[in-house]
């Protein structure tokens, strides 16, 4: 049986050993729900990795958004280089759901752009679950949305062995049945081509490799794996399993049954409209559905096939859909990261989906069975949990109520303590903050400032810019990739101060940040609740000089609770440090691009050890940077722009480290 092999250059420290032991024991005793209450920067991901390695179960990790899922996936891949760590998020770069607005008689057709890279990763994830047990899938909440029947997906796979008797025509028919497209010129993912007795297939779950099946008569003579770009042979295989190119692929018999079932529902629905005199709706539904049926008959696929998923999988009306969770074996482990955000998200998915579809069904754009192409309801999601660990610095009411064990991880491995929190009056707050910023910039540290309104954030950014501060404003219109670049530039010192409204969003745990300023801290609301304030305070917890200033004229109940909880943790941490003679150190974290988490192959970069850099003489350091600069220019000349950009960032980071050391 495959085991998880955890690779790390460090061992559990602080509260990690206790948390790992308690959570592992809880899982082995069969506890269904546990919570890891881990403060920011306490190494919760490393604790999770150790628990996964100990219990050795296939694991689903659910994160609240794509960016956080990408970060977690990158970290788990570093911890488990020999195991299958997969990424499963919504494959839409852009998604406009199908909708109808009766007030203006406006039909909005579904419009989307599918990210081929993410679609490949989704196929890779489901294929891994059928091929091995040492699998970790990091997913967003999209994992509770409908997917094809896992049993059908497994049964439809094309299995080819060397020496097997398999007619050429039978292989080709099978490939078409499982939604592979024949294309003699363009061999890309989900396509195949034929040259005499040689069949070349690019499996849906592969990145840059394809499979060549060589036949001798009806016997499989050789199976080769080759590079799709260069044609170079990578190796010879004894067996290959090619999974369907679509999660909604279905067998001929089931497709016929599904079409019959769709036709019956259509007849019934047309009667319903005609009896009520809704002839326009009846005509619309008939035209659209008959077209879809024709497409299903001819090519086994149609745009919006997911709306017929109930018929294709043979489910009864109202029955929950199959989801990624159904692809896992029964004894799997679930970890819900940032559970205080993720659980409410899961809870709200069904209602949002239902309300949008009601108009589509009522006005004849879709059959009522479209309601069954939906995310899981919360009670259905609960029923699919085998064992779960909720992970959060501020667990929500659901986790606190249902967990059979709550494990605290307060002590950080670095010895860092929670930041000191100070409340200052709002009068003269901007000038006071400017003085604090100047201090931090002089020490090569960074500052986060959170405001309550867009106008305040914009005005503050403009004012600081006029005062000569290198400042950026992080607003909600910025897309995910641009956010990642802004955060990277903040870490590299391209600018020093980041102003934003919601600093609770992902990726803002930056070790260079030594000051978090909270303006209007006494205005009660979502962003100034106890839980939000504790999360915001945690943004300064990765730096040894971490400090939080709340600007407020009164101390609200939320502020007091957040300050009290921070002081409780701070006291425990300081006592532990005193007892064990630990001197806190700022977290040392490489500026790694989280965008790379979703790429299977990244540019090869030299692994740089900080202590190695600091021991270099000025001359050695200069020569090393010159070498990297040459490599960067060569990469740019060879059109390897990603590698060149990564080398550029590495050079900036190294120079910054050397400057700090001086």
From Swiss-Prot:
Signal peptide: none annotated. Disulfide bonds: none annotated. Gene3D superfamilies: P-loop containing nucleotide triphosphate hydrolases, UVR domain. CDD domains: DEXHc_UvrB (cd17916), SF2_C_UvrB (cd18790). The UvrABC repair system catalyzes the recognition and processing of DNA lesions. A damage recognition complex composed of 2 UvrA and 2 UvrB subunits scans DNA for abnormalities. Upon binding of the UvrA(2)B(2) complex to a putative damaged site, the DNA wraps around one UvrB monomer. DNA wrap is dependent on ATP binding by UvrB and probably causes local melting of the DNA helix, facilitating insertion of UvrB beta-hairpin between the DNA strands. Then UvrB probes one DNA strand for the presence of a lesion. Belongs to the UvrB family. This is UvrABC system protein B. The lineage of its organism: Bacteria, Bacillati, Bacillota, Clostridia, Thermoanaerobacterales. The gene is uvrB.
């Amino acid at each position: 049986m495959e085991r998880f092999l955890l690779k790390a250059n460090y061992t559990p420290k602080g509260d990690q050993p206790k948390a790992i032991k308690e959570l592992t024991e809880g899982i082995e005793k069969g506890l269904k729900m546990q919570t890891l209450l881990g403060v920011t920067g306490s190494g919760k991901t490393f604790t999770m990795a150790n628990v996964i390695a100990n219990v050795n179960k296939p694991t689903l990790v659910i994160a609240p958004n794509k960016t956080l899922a990408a970060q977690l996936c990158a970290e788990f891949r570093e911890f488990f280089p020999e195991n299958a760590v997969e990424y499963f998020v919504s494959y839409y770069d852009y998604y406009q759901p199908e909708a109808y607005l009766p007030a203006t008689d406006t039909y909005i057709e579904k419009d989307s752009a599918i990210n081929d890279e993410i679609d490949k990763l989704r196929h890779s994830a489901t294929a891994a679950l059928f091929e091995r047990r040492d699998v970790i899938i990091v997913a967003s909440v999209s994992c509770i949305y409908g997917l094809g029947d896992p049993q059908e997906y497994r049964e439809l796979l094309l299995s080819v062995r060397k020496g097997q008797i398999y007619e050429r025509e039978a292989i080709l028919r099978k490939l078409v049945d499982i939604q592979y497209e024949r294309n003699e010129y363009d061999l890309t993912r989900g396509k195949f081509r034929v040259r005499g007795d040689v069949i070349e297939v690019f499996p849906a779950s592969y990145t840059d490799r394809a499979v060549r099946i060589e036949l001798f008569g009806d016997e499989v003579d050789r199976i080769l794996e080759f590079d799709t770009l260069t044609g170079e042979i990578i190796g010879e295989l004894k067996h290959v399993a090619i999974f369907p190119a679509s999660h909604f692929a279905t067998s001929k018999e089931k497709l016929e049954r599904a079409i019959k079932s769709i036709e019956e529902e259509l007849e019934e629905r047309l009667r319903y409209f005609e009896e009520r005199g809704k002839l326009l709706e009846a005509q619309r539904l008939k035209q659209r559905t008959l077209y879809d049926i024709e497409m299903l008959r001819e090519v086994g696929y149609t745009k919006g096939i997911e709306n017929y998923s109930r018929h294709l999988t043979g489910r009864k009306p109202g029955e929950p859909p199959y989801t990624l969770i159904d692809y896992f074996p029964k004894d799997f482990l679930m970890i819900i990261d940032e559970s205080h955000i993720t659980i409410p998200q899961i809870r709200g998915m069904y209602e949002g989906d239902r309300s949008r579809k009601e108009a589509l069904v009522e006005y004849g754009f879709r059959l009522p069975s479209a309601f069954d192409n939906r995310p899981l309801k919360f009670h259905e999601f609960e029923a699919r949990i085998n064992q779960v660990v909720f992970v959060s610095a501020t667990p929500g009411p659901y986790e606190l109520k249902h967990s059979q064990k709550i494990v605290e991880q307060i002590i950080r491995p670095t010895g860092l303590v929670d930041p000191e929190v100070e409340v200052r009056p709002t009068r003269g707050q901007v000038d006071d903050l400017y003085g604090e910023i100047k201090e931090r910039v002089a020490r090569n540290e960074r500052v986060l400032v959170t405001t309550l309104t867009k106008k305040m954030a914009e005005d503050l950014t403009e004012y600081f810019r006029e005062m000569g501060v290198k400042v950026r404003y992080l607003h909600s219109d910025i897309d995910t990739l641009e956010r990642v670049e802004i955060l990277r530039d903040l870490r590299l010192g391209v600018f020093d101060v980041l102003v934003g409204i919601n600093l609770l969003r992902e990726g803002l745990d930056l070790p260079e940040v030594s000051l978090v300023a909270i303006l209007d801290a006494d205005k009660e609301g979502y962003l100034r609740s106890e839980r939000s304030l504790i999360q915001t305070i945690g943004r300064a917890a990765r730096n040894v000089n971490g400090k939080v200033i709340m600007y407020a004229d009164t101390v609200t109940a939320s502020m007091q609770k957040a300050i009290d909880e921070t002081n409780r943790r701070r006291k425990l941490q300081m006592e532990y440090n005193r007892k064990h003679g630990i001197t806190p150190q700022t977290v040392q974290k490489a500026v790694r691009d989280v965008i790379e988490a979703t790429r299977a192959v990244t540019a090869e970069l030299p692994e740089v050890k900080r202590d190695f850099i600091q021991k270099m003489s000025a001359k050695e350091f200069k020569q090393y940077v010159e070498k990297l600069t040459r490599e960067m220019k060569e990469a740019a000349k060879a059109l390897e722009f990603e590698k060149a950009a990564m080398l550029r960032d590495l050079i900036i980071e190294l120079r910054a480290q050397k400057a700090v050391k001086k």
